[in-house]
Amino acid sequence: MKASGSGLLELMCTVVEIKEKMKAFYADAAGKCGDSVGTETFNMLRDMEQKHLDRLNATYADLSKGSGDLDACRFYDFEAPGSSEVMHKLKQKRESTSNACLDDVAAIESGMELENKGIEFFLARLKEAAEPIEREFLTHMIAEERSHYILLADLKFYYVDTEHWFMQKGKTGLDGA
């Protein structure tokens, strides 16, 4: 299916701008976070945004030349490691949490707010979308942003209440067994 309108191209251009801002935010947050868990999480989110940008830019370039196929907008299953990749390491190490990133909980909350604004933007555009491929693209973007939001929420929980985080993630019981 060949590209016929500029609506999808405009949308992709806007998405690239949003992703660039998110990538810059995560790079900045990683540089300011003195704790390895926070730094690793922010770096992982930055790298995920870069992968999304690479794919979006390549697809946009092909479509804007008229040589692209709208099927290129169909995203494969995106990588959503969630908290399992970073947080699994914590459960194994069971290191004590430094207070280095407690000051950066505000950065985590800002990231959550940024992801939430992205979700709201994509939901609003989804309501207006008429083309099935555009709807599929937006649905994918919403799922992607939600996975990032969940990862940040988990990181915030880890820093705010580490003991309960370990109890919940480690499936620790309180019966003493």
Feature-to-residue mapping (PLM):
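Non-heme di-metal
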Residues: M1-A177
